[in-house]
């Protein structure tokens, strides 16, 4: 039993204390994190290289490692000597509900910020920028126009699914869109010849191609077909928490931590592109 001033806190008093800290109107996300010394991180198990599970089962990837760094900075802001990171697996379908319902504090995966999504959750300053493209078979069609009458795979419930439909419509191309439950399922469909191309963010496609049964038979189409600005999703309306997360990210960008996180994910000699360097320079807010 916890002691305060040498006196016991009996169950009734504990219940009242919990009610005061649990109410969203009384205590925000930062207060709860400080009270529990824990932060709840939602991540995807199937979105490498940004958010996925290692063979050991541990969450990893660029966004996961970035959120680990954010959590450390939040702990420093709250003067915590330790912080527990509780990871919650989510899918492309239920990820925003995990934040909106209060099950998780941060969504750490390749999340594209959009106006419609802002109706459900808030977003941090930008964390990455990517673009969607096509992973194709080297013996098949090599452009979006050449895919007329073919099957194109895409992850269901994502902005890339909407972008693919819009791209086909604007180009006047009739092709069958084959939704995949996971990127790995999409890769399997491409490997087996059930689809002629797989549509996703290019960084994800590069990683997927390396996992193919026959990577030498796959290639990336040249053109970017969309621009995807990533950010961390967090509870809507909690300005104090968003400010704390943005402060943490700004410090990570300014002190060079972001370069080490990037190198860990994309290879020891890999560095952020000129576009990403500019993004981090602009996004990092001064104290």
Language model regions located:
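A ligand-binding cleft/hinge motif common to bilobed small-molecule-binding domains
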Residues: 94, 108-120, 163-170, 191-192, ...
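Extracytoplasmic small-molecule ligand-binding "clamshell" domains
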Residues: 28-107, 255
């Amino acid at each position: 039993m916890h002691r305060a001033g040498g006196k016991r806190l009996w169950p009734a008093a504990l219940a009242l204390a919990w009610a005061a800290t649990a109410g969203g109107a009384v205590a925000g996300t930062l207060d709860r994190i400080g009270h529990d010394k824990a932060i709840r991180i939602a991540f995807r198990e199937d979105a490498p290289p940004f958010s996925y599970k290692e063979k050991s089962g541990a969450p990893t990837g660029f966004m996961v490692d970035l959120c680990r760094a954010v959590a450390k900075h939040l702990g420093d802001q709250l003067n915590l000597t330790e912080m527990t990171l509780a990871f919650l697996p989510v899918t492309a379908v239920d990820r925003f509900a995990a934040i909106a319902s209060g099950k998780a504090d941060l969504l750490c995966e390749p999340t594209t910020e959009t106006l419609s999504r802002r109706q459900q959750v808030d977003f941090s300053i930008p964390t990455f920028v990517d673009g969607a493209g096509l992973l194709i078979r080297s013996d098949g069609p090599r452009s979006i126009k050449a895919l007329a009458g073919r099957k194109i795979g895409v992850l269901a419930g994502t902005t890339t699914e909407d972008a693919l439909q819009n791209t086909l419509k604007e180009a006047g191309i009739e092709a069958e869109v084959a939704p995949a439950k996971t990127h790995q399922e999409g890769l399997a469909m491409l490997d087996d010849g059930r689809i002629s191309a797989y549509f996703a963010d290019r960084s994800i496609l590069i990683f997927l191609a390396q996992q193919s049964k026959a990577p030498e038979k796959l290639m990336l189409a040249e053109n970017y077909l969309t621009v995807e600005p990533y950010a961390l999703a967090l509870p809507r309306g909690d300005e104090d928490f968003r400010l704390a997360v943005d402060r943490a990210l700004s410090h990570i960008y300014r002190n060079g931590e972001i370069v080490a996180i990037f190198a860990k994910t994309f290879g020891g000699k890999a560095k952020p592109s000129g576009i990403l360097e500019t993004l981090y320079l602009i996004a990092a807010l001064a104290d």
